[in-house]
Each structure stands twice: as structure tokens, then as C-alpha cells.
Amino acid sequence: MSVAFASARPRGKGEVTQQTIQKMLDENHHLIQCILDYQSKGKTAECTQYQQILHRNLVYLATIADSNQNMQSLLPAPPTQNMNLGPGALSQSGSSQGLHPQGSLSDTVSTGLPPASLMQGQIGNGPNHVSMQQTAQSTLPTTSMSMSGSGHGTGPGYSHSGPTSQSVPMQGQGAISNYVSRTNINMQSNPVSMMHQQAARPTTTQRRVEASITRARRPLHDGPGWQGGSMMGQRPMAPYRPSQQGSSQQYLGQEEYYSEQYSHSQGSAEPMSQQYYPDGHSDYAYQQSSYTEQSYDRSFEDPTQHYYEGGNSQYSQQQAGYQQGTAQQQTYSQQQYPNQQSYPGQQQGYGPAQGAPSQYSGYQQGQGQQYGSYRTSQTGPSAQQQRPYGYEQGQYGNYQQ
């Protein structure tokens, strides 16, 4: 059969017409269908025979394409059609088809990894693409580091200290696109606009994501301090929210998102997220989060030592101040520190316009100096006031990035 076909095949270039090529394409399609049928039936001999015929047709079409540039207008269909045919079509498609397999592969890759392709399109950095894949694979720590490196020049400093999934907030500061793509991955396609709604209504998806993030980060937070950390995450959320200034909004979205997850992970936290999100006042955040469970504040002492190795004493003191009670904390944020009204107003806290807030602005910028600024500024009771921020920012931004 193959011999008969070979003899019937047109030989001269002048004989090649669109009808001839279309006829050959139709025959190729028929051959492919036959090959598939025989493969499903297990008839390898017939499959081999038809594959040889198909191979000759493809080689002939490739020869026409190479020899006659004018035929390119007639040949786009064969490569596209033959691409999906089978191994024979790919291997024998020739130069014109050689380009299509790559396109198909790239499409497959981008389709299989929509977050990665989205990230790559938004940021335009190859490393982000890789890091997104890693995120999908639950290697959040590694992802955070690579994201920090590629998305922000200052990010790597944080990735060293705590390469956990929490580096996402810092990514959000760099660009909303980063933040959105990271949000898609971590939240499983939950849009940023839905975060506030989700805070009030935890979803099963959030709980799953939170559980996975908790497992990924748990090695870094030894002991009970980990849960304290997740609770602590809620405190900054409210503060960050009102402080939506410039990039802090992006960061804020991440913080709220994480606070939602963490608040859901601990039953007592849900009311907190619901209450202080609407108001966005640090007072609410502190009253609810830090005072719902004082044991959780104590549990922070251990993690603070882990996080702030350089300033353990200061942070532990701050924690002690927290543990002292709701009344004191409120007075701290509201009365004793009018100069640091970053807590009551919170917007000022992040606003780069004020002295203490400069720490936060630096933090928004993702600079490693924040730790130093936190420690220095946190001398005396003011340190206690800032400590929730310093700690939580460390956990969400500085540390985990």
C-alpha cells in the first residue's frame, strides 16, 4: 500500500497545488485515525505500516515547505493538524512543525501552572515563575525567598531571617501583581477584594490553606509560640488596614488575608477578625486578639526570642507588657503614647510622615533596618506598644520574608 501511494504521489514542484496538499492532509488525518484505532485494538503491525505512510507524507510536506517559500501559506494547517497526531507526526513534521511543538509545550506548561504564568506575566521575572511553581508544591519557604529576591532588591534580607510563606506580604508591597499572584496561590484563587468578606465568613478553602501554611511554617516556630504567632498575626492586621498608604495597602491585603486564616485556625480569633476589620482600629485588634488569650501572649515570648535574637530582652519585655492586661494595652495605645499615635490611628503608624511610623514606612519598603529601628524605638513602654507591631510585622513581613 505504501508503495502504491508513493508512486501516486506528485513529484514535481509545479504539480503541487492547494488541492493536492489538502488531499494529502485529509489522507494524513485518515491515517492518523486508523493508527489510533489499531493502537486501541493492539494491532501493532498495522500501526507501523500506517505510521510509515504518514511519515512519508509529512516528510513530503516538509520538503515542499523548505523548497518553496510560497507554499508556506498553504502549510500552516498540516503542522497544526499533525501536531496532535502522535509520535510519528512530531518526529517527522520537519522544520515548519518543529516550531509548533514548542508552542504547544509552552501552552501546556502555562496552562498547567496558571499561577506561575500569571506571575511571570505580571512581574516579568523568570525567578518568579520558578518560585510560583515551588509555591504550588507547598515549598513555601523556598518560594518566599526566591520571590523576595526577584521581586524586591530589599526582600532577600527578610527571606534569610524567616523564609516562610509569610514573605508574601512583602511581595505585595513591591507590586500588586506580585501580591495578587501570591494571593491566588495561597488563597486558592480567592480575589483580594473578597478578603474582607472572608474575614467575616471563613471558608473551607481558607481553613485548608491556613492548615497547609501552618504545617509549612511550624518548623520555624518551635513550641506553643507558633499558635501565639498566628494569633499575633491578627493584631497587626487591623492596624495595617487603616494605614493603607501607598504600598502599605498591598501589604495590608496580605496581612488581612493571613489574619483571617489565623483567626479561623483559632476559634476565639474569628470574632476578632470580624470586629476589627470593620473598624480597622488597633484598639480593637489589641483588645480582642491580645487579650482574648493571654496565654497566647506568653507563648509569644519563645517565638520572639527566635525571631528577634538580637533584641530578645526588649521583645520579651514588650510581651510582658502585653500580658499585663487589656486596660494597660489600651492605655498604651491611646494615652501613654500620644506621640506614637500609630496605634490608635494606625494610619499614622504606617504613615512615613511620623517619627515612630518611620519604622513602619521602612518596613513597608522591605528594608532590613526595620529590626534595628524596632529595637531602638522599643525602649521603655513605647517598646511594649510597638512590640505587637514589631513582632507581627516581623512575623508577617520582616521575618517571614
From Swiss-Prot:
Function: Transcriptional activator which is required for calcium-dependent dendritic growth and branching in cortical neurons. Recruits CREB-binding protein (CREBBP) to nuclear bodies. Component of the CREST-BRG1 complex, a multiprotein complex that regulates promoter activation by orchestrating a calcium-dependent release of a repressor complex and a recruitment of an activator complex. In resting neurons, transcription of the c-FOS promoter is inhibited by BRG1-dependent recruitment of a phospho-RB1-HDAC1 repressor complex.
Keywords in alphabetical order: Activator, Calcium, Centromere, Chromatin regulator, Chromosome, Kinetochore, Nucleus, Repeat, Transcription, Transcription regulation
Compartments, as annotated in UniProt: Nucleus; Chromosome, Centromere, Kinetochore
A biological process from GO: positive regulation of dendrite morphogenesis
Name of this chain's protein: Calcium-responsive transcription coactivator
Family membership: Belongs to the SS18 family.
Stretches for region Disordered: 72-171, 214-401
Polar residues: bias regions: 128-137, 260-276, 285-294, 375-387
